[in-house]
Regions:
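Short, surface-exposed beta-edge/turn micro-motifs
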Residues: 54, 103, 175, 191-192, ...
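A structural signal for well-ordered alpha-helical segments within the folded catalytic domains
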Residues: 87-90, 135, 139, 237-245
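Extracellular/periplasmic catalytic domains that process cell-envelope and extracellular macromolecules
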Residues: 47-52, 172, 187-189, 287-291
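Short, solvent-exposed loop/turn segments at secondary-structure junctions
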Residues: 61-65, 112-114, 161-163, 183-186, ...
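GT-A fold catalytic core of metal-dependent nucleotide-sugar glycosyltransferases
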Residues: 123, 133-202
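Catalytic core and acceptor-binding pocket of nucleotide-sugar-dependent glycosyltransferases
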Residues: 203-310
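N-terminal anchoring/stem segment of glycosyltransferases
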Residues: 3-130, 146-150, 199-200
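Short, hydrophobic beta-strand segments that form beta-sheet elements in well-ordered domains
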Residues: 101-111, 153-160, 178-179, 296
Length: 315
Protein backbone atom coordinates (compact mmCIF):
# COMPACT_ATOMS: atom_id res chain seq x y z
CA UNK A 1 0.00 0.00 0.00
CA UNK A 2 2.80 2.40 0.91
CA UNK A 3 4.57 1.57 -2.36
CA UNK A 4 1.44 2.41 -4.37
CA UNK A 5 1.05 5.67 -2.45
CA UNK A 6 4.66 6.58 -3.22
CA UNK A 7 4.12 5.89 -6.92
CA UNK A 8 0.97 8.03 -7.02
CA UNK A 9 2.71 10.84 -5.13
CA UNK A 10 5.64 10.69 -7.56
CA UNK A 11 3.34 10.93 -10.59
CA UNK A 12 1.39 13.80 -9.00
CA UNK A 13 4.62 15.76 -8.58
CA UNK A 14 5.52 15.18 -12.22
CA UNK A 15 2.10 16.27 -13.48
CA UNK A 16 2.51 19.50 -11.51
CA UNK A 17 5.03 20.64 -14.13
CA UNK A 18 2.08 21.68 -16.33
CA UNK A 19 0.64 23.86 -13.57
CA UNK A 20 4.08 25.41 -13.10
CA UNK A 21 4.36 26.11 -16.85
CA UNK A 22 0.92 27.72 -16.92
CA UNK A 23 1.59 29.94 -13.90
CA UNK A 24 4.99 30.99 -15.21
CA UNK A 25 3.61 31.69 -18.67
CA UNK A 26 0.93 33.94 -17.22
CA UNK A 27 3.46 35.81 -15.11
CA UNK A 28 5.74 36.30 -18.11
CA UNK A 29 2.86 37.41 -20.32
CA UNK A 30 1.67 39.93 -17.74
CA UNK A 31 5.07 41.32 -16.95
CA UNK A 32 7.32 43.36 -19.17
CA UNK A 33 10.02 40.92 -20.02
CA UNK A 34 13.06 43.14 -20.11
CA UNK A 35 15.95 42.49 -22.41
CA UNK A 36 18.62 41.30 -20.02
CA UNK A 37 22.13 42.41 -20.80
CA UNK A 38 23.73 39.22 -22.04
CA UNK A 39 27.49 38.91 -22.29
CA UNK A 40 27.99 36.59 -25.25
CA UNK A 41 31.14 34.64 -26.03
CA UNK A 42 33.39 36.43 -28.50
CA UNK A 43 33.72 34.09 -31.48
CA UNK A 44 35.36 36.51 -33.92
CA UNK A 45 38.55 34.47 -34.07
CA UNK A 46 36.68 31.49 -35.52
CA UNK A 47 35.35 31.17 -39.05
CA UNK A 48 32.89 29.18 -41.10
CA UNK A 49 31.86 28.92 -44.75
CA UNK A 50 28.45 28.47 -46.30
CA UNK A 51 27.73 24.86 -47.10
CA UNK A 52 24.88 22.60 -48.17
CA UNK A 53 25.91 20.31 -45.31
CA UNK A 54 24.91 20.59 -41.66
CA UNK A 55 26.76 22.24 -38.82
CA UNK A 56 26.57 20.60 -35.40
CA UNK A 57 26.96 22.50 -32.13
CA UNK A 58 27.83 20.66 -28.91
CA UNK A 59 28.47 21.76 -25.33
CA UNK A 60 30.58 19.78 -22.88
CA UNK A 61 31.95 20.62 -19.45
CA UNK A 62 34.22 18.63 -17.19
CA UNK A 63 32.52 18.37 -13.81
CA UNK A 64 35.07 17.75 -11.05
CA UNK A 65 33.33 18.28 -7.73
CA UNK A 66 30.26 16.30 -6.57
CA UNK A 67 27.18 17.86 -8.20
CA UNK A 68 23.92 16.28 -7.06
CA UNK A 69 20.90 16.76 -9.33
CA UNK A 70 17.78 16.31 -7.23
CA UNK A 71 14.45 17.84 -8.27
CA UNK A 72 10.95 16.69 -7.50
CA UNK A 73 10.20 15.76 -11.12
CA UNK A 74 13.31 13.54 -11.36
CA UNK A 75 12.61 9.98 -10.24
CA UNK A 76 16.05 9.38 -8.75
CA UNK A 77 18.75 11.91 -7.89
CA UNK A 78 22.20 11.48 -9.40
CA UNK A 79 25.67 12.99 -9.24
CA UNK A 80 26.90 14.59 -12.47
CA UNK A 81 30.42 13.80 -11.36
CA UNK A 82 29.61 10.08 -11.58
CA UNK A 83 28.27 10.23 -15.14
CA UNK A 84 30.95 9.42 -17.71
CA UNK A 85 30.26 11.70 -20.66
CA UNK A 86 33.80 11.34 -22.01
CA UNK A 87 33.25 7.97 -23.70
CA UNK A 88 29.97 8.98 -25.31
CA UNK A 89 31.39 12.36 -26.42
CA UNK A 90 34.40 10.66 -28.00
CA UNK A 91 32.15 8.19 -29.83
CA UNK A 92 29.85 10.96 -31.03
CA UNK A 93 32.67 13.15 -32.33
CA UNK A 94 34.25 10.30 -34.26
CA UNK A 95 30.87 9.33 -35.67
CA UNK A 96 30.10 12.90 -36.78
CA UNK A 97 33.55 13.32 -38.32
CA UNK A 98 32.95 10.36 -40.62
CA UNK A 99 29.69 11.74 -42.00
CA UNK A 100 29.95 13.40 -45.39
CA UNK A 101 26.80 15.38 -44.53
CA UNK A 102 28.51 17.27 -41.70
CA UNK A 103 30.23 20.54 -42.55
CA UNK A 104 31.63 21.56 -39.14
CA UNK A 105 31.34 20.41 -35.55
CA UNK A 106 31.60 23.28 -33.07
CA UNK A 107 32.38 22.01 -29.58
CA UNK A 108 32.09 24.57 -26.78
CA UNK A 109 34.05 23.15 -23.87
CA UNK A 110 36.53 23.71 -21.05
CA UNK A 111 38.54 20.60 -21.97
CA UNK A 112 41.10 19.81 -24.67
CA UNK A 113 40.58 17.26 -27.45
CA UNK A 114 44.19 16.36 -28.17
CA UNK A 115 43.58 12.94 -29.70
CA UNK A 116 41.32 14.24 -32.48
CA UNK A 117 42.96 16.34 -35.18
CA UNK A 118 40.46 17.10 -37.91
CA UNK A 119 39.63 20.41 -39.58
CA UNK A 120 35.92 19.61 -39.35
CA UNK A 121 36.12 19.77 -35.55
CA UNK A 122 36.33 23.29 -34.11
CA UNK A 123 37.06 23.33 -30.38
CA UNK A 124 35.93 26.59 -28.80
CA UNK A 125 37.57 26.78 -25.37
CA UNK A 126 35.49 28.76 -22.90
CA UNK A 127 35.34 29.26 -19.16
CA UNK A 128 32.34 27.40 -17.77
CA UNK A 129 30.78 27.98 -14.37
CA UNK A 130 29.54 24.49 -13.47
CA UNK A 131 27.23 26.01 -10.86
CA UNK A 132 25.36 27.48 -13.85
CA UNK A 133 25.84 24.54 -16.19
CA UNK A 134 22.61 24.67 -18.23
CA UNK A 135 22.65 28.46 -18.33
CA UNK A 136 26.14 28.24 -19.82
CA UNK A 137 24.85 25.79 -22.44
CA UNK A 138 22.01 28.11 -23.44
CA UNK A 139 24.50 30.98 -23.61
CA UNK A 140 26.65 29.06 -26.13
CA UNK A 141 23.65 28.63 -28.46
CA UNK A 142 22.79 32.31 -28.15
CA UNK A 143 26.42 33.25 -28.82
CA UNK A 144 26.61 30.99 -31.87
CA UNK A 145 23.54 32.39 -33.66
CA UNK A 146 24.84 35.92 -33.00
CA UNK A 147 28.25 35.18 -34.51
CA UNK A 148 29.66 34.85 -38.01
CA UNK A 149 29.67 31.06 -37.52
CA UNK A 150 25.92 30.73 -38.07
CA UNK A 151 25.84 30.27 -41.84
CA UNK A 152 24.25 26.86 -42.38
CA UNK A 153 21.46 24.60 -41.22
CA UNK A 154 22.50 23.83 -37.66
CA UNK A 155 21.83 21.01 -35.20
CA UNK A 156 22.17 22.05 -31.55
CA UNK A 157 22.37 18.75 -29.68
CA UNK A 158 23.41 17.27 -26.36
CA UNK A 159 26.64 15.29 -26.43
CA UNK A 160 24.62 12.09 -25.89
CA UNK A 161 22.46 12.71 -28.97
CA UNK A 162 23.35 10.75 -32.10
CA UNK A 163 22.01 11.85 -35.49
CA UNK A 164 21.40 9.36 -38.27
CA UNK A 165 21.92 11.71 -41.20
CA UNK A 166 20.71 9.07 -43.66
CA UNK A 167 17.30 9.23 -41.98
CA UNK A 168 17.27 12.95 -41.11
CA UNK A 169 15.32 14.21 -44.12
CA UNK A 170 13.88 17.12 -42.19
CA UNK A 171 15.49 20.36 -43.39
CA UNK A 172 13.46 20.25 -46.62
CA UNK A 173 10.29 20.78 -44.56
CA UNK A 174 8.75 24.18 -43.94
CA UNK A 175 10.10 25.57 -40.65
CA UNK A 176 12.66 27.90 -39.10
CA UNK A 177 13.24 26.04 -35.83
CA UNK A 178 12.31 22.40 -35.17
CA UNK A 179 11.83 21.00 -31.67
CA UNK A 180 10.86 17.59 -30.36
CA UNK A 181 7.97 16.90 -28.01
CA UNK A 182 7.17 14.04 -25.67
CA UNK A 183 3.66 12.69 -25.30
CA UNK A 184 4.20 11.10 -21.90
CA UNK A 185 2.43 13.57 -19.65
CA UNK A 186 4.80 13.15 -16.71
CA UNK A 187 7.67 14.81 -18.59
CA UNK A 188 8.29 18.40 -19.59
CA UNK A 189 6.84 18.45 -23.14
CA UNK A 190 9.72 19.97 -25.12
CA UNK A 191 13.21 18.53 -24.73
CA UNK A 192 16.14 20.92 -25.20
CA UNK A 193 18.55 18.16 -26.24
CA UNK A 194 17.62 18.56 -29.92
CA UNK A 195 17.12 21.98 -31.55
CA UNK A 196 17.30 22.17 -35.35
CA UNK A 197 17.67 25.65 -36.86
CA UNK A 198 17.48 26.59 -40.52
CA UNK A 199 19.85 29.17 -41.93
CA UNK A 200 17.12 31.03 -43.85
CA UNK A 201 15.93 33.07 -40.87
CA UNK A 202 19.08 34.24 -39.14
CA UNK A 203 17.66 37.50 -37.78
CA UNK A 204 14.57 35.76 -36.42
CA UNK A 205 16.68 33.01 -34.85
CA UNK A 206 18.66 35.68 -33.02
CA UNK A 207 15.40 37.00 -31.54
CA UNK A 208 14.35 33.48 -30.54
CA UNK A 209 17.54 32.75 -28.63
CA UNK A 210 17.64 36.24 -27.12
CA UNK A 211 14.21 35.66 -25.61
CA UNK A 212 15.32 32.18 -24.58
CA UNK A 213 18.01 33.87 -22.47
CA UNK A 214 15.64 36.59 -21.24
CA UNK A 215 13.15 34.02 -19.97
CA UNK A 216 15.94 32.06 -18.29
CA UNK A 217 17.05 35.14 -16.36
CA UNK A 218 13.45 35.98 -15.44
CA UNK A 219 12.40 32.59 -14.10
CA UNK A 220 15.52 32.23 -11.95
CA UNK A 221 14.00 34.99 -9.81
CA UNK A 222 10.47 33.56 -9.86
CA UNK A 223 8.88 32.42 -6.61
CA UNK A 224 6.92 29.80 -8.57
CA UNK A 225 10.21 28.23 -9.64
CA UNK A 226 11.85 28.53 -6.23
CA UNK A 227 8.89 26.79 -4.61
CA UNK A 228 8.97 23.98 -7.19
CA UNK A 229 12.69 23.48 -7.84
CA UNK A 230 14.54 25.37 -5.12
CA UNK A 231 16.94 28.25 -5.56
CA UNK A 232 19.24 27.04 -8.34
CA UNK A 233 17.89 26.18 -11.79
CA UNK A 234 20.96 27.70 -13.42
CA UNK A 235 22.70 24.35 -13.03
CA UNK A 236 19.86 22.10 -14.28
CA UNK A 237 16.28 22.29 -15.49
CA UNK A 238 16.38 26.02 -16.23
CA UNK A 239 17.20 25.70 -19.93
CA UNK A 240 14.49 23.17 -20.61
CA UNK A 241 11.95 25.12 -18.56
CA UNK A 242 12.82 28.34 -20.42
CA UNK A 243 12.45 26.66 -23.82
CA UNK A 244 9.05 25.25 -22.86
CA UNK A 245 7.90 28.70 -21.79
CA UNK A 246 9.20 30.28 -24.98
CA UNK A 247 7.09 27.97 -27.15
CA UNK A 248 4.22 27.56 -24.67
CA UNK A 249 1.13 26.93 -26.76
CA UNK A 250 -2.36 25.70 -25.89
CA UNK A 251 -1.32 24.25 -22.57
CA UNK A 252 1.77 22.69 -24.12
CA UNK A 253 -0.09 19.69 -25.51
CA UNK A 254 1.50 19.44 -28.94
CA UNK A 255 0.73 17.44 -32.06
CA UNK A 256 3.24 15.70 -34.29
CA UNK A 257 4.41 17.98 -37.14
CA UNK A 258 2.42 20.92 -35.78
CA UNK A 259 3.44 24.41 -36.97
CA UNK A 260 3.08 27.75 -35.17
CA UNK A 261 4.99 31.02 -34.91
CA UNK A 262 7.22 32.24 -32.07
CA UNK A 263 9.15 35.50 -32.49
CA UNK A 264 8.50 35.36 -36.27
CA UNK A 265 10.06 31.89 -36.38
CA UNK A 266 7.94 29.10 -37.82
CA UNK A 267 8.23 26.31 -35.25
CA UNK A 268 7.89 22.67 -36.28
CA UNK A 269 7.09 20.13 -33.58
CA UNK A 270 8.61 16.71 -34.23
CA UNK A 271 7.76 13.42 -32.50
CA UNK A 272 10.44 12.23 -30.11
CA UNK A 273 9.69 8.68 -31.23
CA UNK A 274 11.72 9.30 -34.39
CA UNK A 275 13.66 12.51 -33.78
CA UNK A 276 14.69 12.22 -30.12
CA UNK A 277 14.26 8.56 -29.33
CA UNK A 278 15.47 7.41 -25.92
CA UNK A 279 16.03 3.66 -25.60
CA UNK A 280 14.83 2.10 -22.37
CA UNK A 281 17.58 0.54 -20.29
CA UNK A 282 15.52 -2.60 -19.62
CA UNK A 283 14.46 -3.19 -23.25
CA UNK A 284 16.25 -5.09 -26.00
CA UNK A 285 16.32 -3.43 -29.44
CA UNK A 286 17.50 -4.79 -32.75
CA UNK A 287 20.19 -2.78 -34.51
CA UNK A 288 17.99 -2.49 -37.61
CA UNK A 289 15.24 -0.92 -35.47
CA UNK A 290 17.58 1.67 -33.98
CA UNK A 291 19.17 2.45 -37.34
CA UNK A 292 15.77 3.58 -38.63
CA UNK A 293 15.57 6.31 -35.98
CA UNK A 294 16.57 9.77 -37.20
CA UNK A 295 17.94 10.82 -33.81
CA UNK A 296 18.72 8.71 -30.75
CA UNK A 297 19.22 10.28 -27.33
CA UNK A 298 21.10 8.17 -24.78
CA UNK A 299 19.52 10.17 -22.01
CA UNK A 300 19.96 9.47 -18.32
CA UNK A 301 22.82 8.16 -16.23
CA UNK A 302 21.65 4.53 -16.61
CA UNK A 303 21.89 4.64 -20.39
CA UNK A 304 25.41 6.05 -20.23
CA UNK A 305 26.45 2.84 -18.49
CA UNK A 306 25.02 0.58 -21.21
CA UNK A 307 26.03 2.74 -24.17
CA UNK A 308 28.68 0.20 -25.16
CA UNK A 309 25.84 -2.16 -26.14
CA UNK A 310 24.83 0.24 -28.90
CA UNK A 311 28.26 1.28 -30.14
CA UNK A 312 28.10 -1.04 -33.16
CA UNK A 313 25.45 1.24 -34.70
CA UNK A 314 28.03 3.99 -35.10
CA UNK A 315 31.18 2.04 -35.94
Amino acid sequence: MNNLLNILTDHKKKYEIFELLENLYKSISLSKLKNTKIKTHNLDSYSNLESSNFDVVLFHSKVIKPTIINYQDITKSFDLNNVNYDEILDANLNYLLRSYKVNKIFLFSNISIDKINNEKLVLIKIDINNDKLMYERTLTMHSFVNSNLFKNNTCFIDTDVFINFEELNIFSKNFDIALTHRTKQTFMPINEGVILVKKNGISNAKEFFRNYMNIYSFICRSNYVKNFYGNNIYIWRGGQLSLNLLVYNKGSIFKDYENFYVDKNLILILPSFNYNFTPKAQTTYSLSYLRKKSIIHYKGHKLKKIFSNFKSIYF
